[in-house]
């Protein structure tokens, strides 16, 4: 659990545009995580 929380605070995973978040689908914009919209698979 400590590893997951650390990665969540860090932001984007290396070599991956998606964030390591278990709460739901998210994508990265730079080094920050943004939630995906419900109706589309694009970042808000």
From Swiss-Prot:
Name the organs or tissues of expression: Expressed by the venom gland.
Propeptide at: 1-9
Q: Does the keyword ATP-binding apply?
A: no
Q: Which cysteines are joined by disulfide bonds?
A: 12-28, 19-33, 27-43
Q: Which domain of life is it from?
A: Eukaryota
Q: Which UniProt keywords apply?
A: Disulfide bond, Knottin, Neurotoxin, Secreted, Toxin
Drop me one GO molecular function for this one: toxin activity
Where it sits in the cell: the answer is: Secreted
The record's GO CC annotations read: extracellular region
The protein's job, in short, is: Insect active toxin causing rapid but reversible paralysis in crickets. No activity shown in mammals. Does not show effect on mammalian voltage-gated calcium channels.
Q: Which family does it belong to?
A: Belongs to the neurotoxin 01 (U2-agtx) family.
**Protein name (record):** U2-agatoxin-Ao1s
Identify the species of origin. Agelena orientalis (Funnel-web spider)
